Amino acid sequence: MKAIIVLLMVVTSNADRICTGITSSNSPHVVKTATQGEVNVTGVIPLTTTPTKSHFANLKGTKTRGKLCPNCLNCTDLDVALARPMCIGTIPSAKASILHEVRPVTSGCFPIMHDRTKIRQLPNLLRGYENIRLSTHNVINAERAPGGPYRLGTSGSCPNVTSRSGFFATMAWAVPRDNKTATNPLTVEVPYICTKGEDQITVWGFHSDNKTQMKNLYGDSNPQKFTSSANGVTTHYVSQIGGFPNQTEDGGLPQSGRIVVDYMVQKPGKTGTIVYQRGVLLPQKVWCASGRSKVIKGSLPLIGEADCLHEKYGGLNKSKPYYTGEHAKAIGNCPIWVKTPLKLANGTKYRPPAKLLKER
């Protein structure tokens, strides 16, 4: 009677192999069994593939998001996240999102001091949500906020559909109308206004310039202090006065000042607070976001469909259960990374023919 054996590993000169099998004839493949050591098997089946780089693709069976706003032409994802005029549109829902912009990423309207805050993370924060929408109402009345009344500042580099000058829809540049004097820290409460139990992402910031401009705009040329607090996270800033080279955004006039932009995440029903002095950019429209979207670094455009998205190889179709090559983050129905090639071998222990007994 032939014995049934489970073959565990094929021994070759160039690969590790996982094997199973049953008794069969002789073959050049040597396997290691759990109980009988090395035996011969046949029928080796490759289990691994080594991918080649390809275009990123839409993930099969899943809505995949490339740009935050596909219909917002000539807009970076940071433009969309800050709601720059002419960059406001519908963000499609998606279970998977491509992080396609490479640092540093700028936004028009006004020169931003990116390194002072986590503002570069804002587009990626939004990508991590399945559903994202911009509120239709402003979260506070900026013109009548504490320390006002204010007029709302604009930039010639921010034209909108009705005016040659505008500003981000997520913030209001609060410039005192008449009371251009120094002020002690003021506090404004930021209510939760999303209506579907979403996370509320509230964008805010402050403007700073050289001493002359600070005096003209705000009546105070000293560094200003700012604090935000929401969801147990508190952030403090002190503005820089002067020392900025002139910078032009999108063909506008050279600007001597800078803005620092940050955001806070408010959970359902929770109020945030902003403590500020002169030059504050008060929050206006907020992002309401829910669900989860898996984020992976990649590139655009998305071409066709794929089983798996891999940071190094792009779109992959799963032809084998394992792969070798570069190990990196992957999402979807992906093969498993292994260090060396694997193969499945089904074969049998070779039994030499019995010797015939000589007749007497």
Swiss-Prot record:
Protein's cellular compartments: Virion membrane; Host apical cell membrane
GO terms assigned for molecular function: host cell surface receptor binding
Main location: virion
Alphabetized SUPFAM superfamilies for the sequence: Viral protein domain
InterPro entries (alphabetical): Capsid_hemagglutn, Hemagglutn_HA1_a/b_dom_sf, Hemagglutn_influenz_A/B
Gene Ontology process terms (BP): fusion of virus membrane with host endosome membrane; fusion of virus membrane with host plasma membrane; symbiont entry into host cell; virion attachment to host cell
Keywords: Disulfide bond, Fusion of virus membrane with host endosomal membrane, Fusion of virus membrane with host membrane, Glycoprotein, Hemagglutinin, Host cell membrane, Host membrane, Host-virus interaction, Lipoprotein, Membrane, Palmitate, Signal, Transmembrane, Viral attachment to host cell, Viral envelope protein, Viral penetration into host cytoplasm, Virion, Virus entry into host cell
Signal peptide: 1-15
Pfam families per UniProt: Hemagglutinin (PF00509)
Modifications made to the protein after synthesis: In natural infection, inactive HA is matured into HA1 and HA2 outside the cell by one or more trypsin-like, arginine-specific endoprotease secreted by the bronchial epithelial cells. One identified protease that may be involved in this process is secreted in lungs by club cells.
Other observations noted: Major glycoprotein, comprises over 80% of the envelope proteins present in virus particle. The extent of infection into host organism is determined by HA. Influenza viruses bud from the apical surface of polarized epithelial cells (e.g. bronchial epithelial cells) into lumen of lungs and are therefore usually pneumotropic. The reason is that HA is cleaved by tryptase clara which is restricted to lungs. However, HAs of H5 and H7 pantropic avian viruses subtypes can be cleaved by furin and subtilisin-type enzymes, allowing the virus to grow in other organs than lungs.
Assembly and interaction partners: Homotrimer of disulfide-linked HA1-HA2.
Functional description taken from the UniProt entry: Binds to sialic acid-containing receptors on the cell surface, bringing about the attachment of the virus particle to the cell. Plays a major role in the determination of host range restriction and virulence. Class I viral fusion protein. Responsible for penetration of the virus into the cell cytoplasm by mediating the fusion of the membrane of the endocytosed virus particle with the endosomal membrane. Low pH in endosomes induce an irreversible conformational change in HA2, releasing the fusion hydrophobic peptide. Several trimers are required to form a competent fusion pore.
Protein name: Hemagglutinin
Organism (species): Influenza B virus (strain B/New York/3/1990)
Gene: HA
